[in-house]
Curated annotation (Swiss-Prot):
Essential cofactor(s): Mn(2+); Mg(2+)
Pfam family of the protein (one): DUF3378
Signal peptide: none
GO terms of molecular function: magnesium ion binding; RNA binding; RNA-DNA hybrid ribonuclease activity
RNase H type-2 domain ranges (all copies): 84-301
Main location: cytoplasm
Species of the source: Geobacillus sp. (strain WCH70)
Name used for this protein in its record: Ribonuclease HIII
InterPro entries: RNase_HII/HIII (IPR001352), RNase_HII/HIII_dom (IPR024567), RNase_HIII (IPR004641), RNase_HIII_N (IPR024568), RNaseH-like_sf (IPR012337), RNaseH_sf (IPR036397), TBP_dom_sf (IPR012295)
Length: 301
């Protein structure tokens, strides 16, 4: 199916909505302003200003609006990986005292890139929790994905055994990627892109004793969400699952658990200690963080 994307101003979006008024459907994907279905073409306009034309008449339909738009965006020089059908992986939770570590792997094929980009998919750190909750469910239905959740008790066990956090992340990334590669089979991704947290050589050194290691076409890039949209998609999925886990843990302990590792977290942990005793932190926190000692001191006051 042919895809074509143009960028529209707010005025132009309103003109398009009026033009396609008789063709507008009721179902809206995440981030969309309207969807119109015409013979040979589906038009999806997004809040980002992107308008996606899909179908055999996509180019012809988009051409009607090209003079009013910014014209085709000048092609930006990109690394070859940016155009590949690829798996991206990213993690969330390693800097948060409360909650698990979540790694997500997501696969975006070439013919899905325009649709995913038009949705406004970008690094989850640039999006609010509300935006994550709005975008992620649709995204997870659109593309193959896998997540791995490392619970707090397991994280604490691994950390007490002397395992560095970088190795923990390497194990989780490899597991999530491996699950997705298996799900995709017989399709083979052209690239597997990890949001870099260590050098590639050290990443594989951490995995040398593992039985199942995904090695082919693996790349590690800093700010990898700018290299391929699959990494941005993975970051959104990982954060969405992390938010769900935080909600679940909050219900279990009877109070809202804050994100991060600041003073607000110290106070929350101290309240948990006072209410339930220090053992409660084992099941909802990363105990090696300095917050544990700070909370213990506050709880004694």
């Amino acid at each position: 199916m042919a895809n074509h994307v143009i960028t529209a101003t707010a005025t132009m979006l309103e003109e398009m909505r009026n033009h396609y008024a008789s063709d507008i459907t009721g179902h809206l994907p995440a981030g969309a302003l309207f969807v119109a279905k015409r013979s040979g073409c589906t038009i999806t306009a997004y809040r980002t200003g992107k308008v996606l034309f899909q179908g055999k008449e996509a180019e012809q339909e988009a051409a009607k609006w090209m003079k009013e738009s910014d014209q085709k965006e000048a092609p930006v020089p990109q690394p070859p990986l940016a155009a590949a059908s690829a798996i991206g992986s990213d993690e969330v939770g390693t800097g948060d005292y409360f909650g698990p570590v979540v790694v997500a792997a997501a696969y975006v094929a070439k013919d899905q890139m325009d649709a995913i980009t038009a949705m406004g998919i970008k690094d989850s750190k640039l999006l609010t929790d509300e935006a994550i909750r709005r975008l992620a469910p649709s995204l997870m239905n659109m593309i193959p994905n896998q997540t791995v959740i490392l619970s707090n008790p397991m994280y604490n066990d691994w950390q007490r055994s002397g395992m560095p956090q970088t190795k923990i992340k390497a194990l989780l990334h490899n597991e999530a990627i491996g699950k997705l590669v298996k799900q995709l089979s017989p399709i083979e991704p052209e690239a597997i892109i990890i949001d870099q947290f260590i050098e590639r050589d050290l990443y594989f050194r951490y995995l040398e004793n593992e039985t199942n290691v995904v090695r082919d076409h693996v790349y590690c890039y800093p700010k990898a969400e700018t290299v391929h949209v699959a990494v941005a998609a993975a970051s959104i999925i990982a954060r969405y699952v992390f938010l769900q886990e935080m909600e679940r843990l909050s219900k279990e302990v009877g109070m809202t658990l804050p994100k991060g590792a600041g003073a607000q977290v110290d106070q929350a942990a101290a309240k948990l200690i006072q209410t339930h005793g220090p053992a409660i932190l084992e099941m909802c926190a990363k105990l090696h963080f300095a917050n544990t000692e700070k909370a213990a001191r506050i709880a004694k006051k």
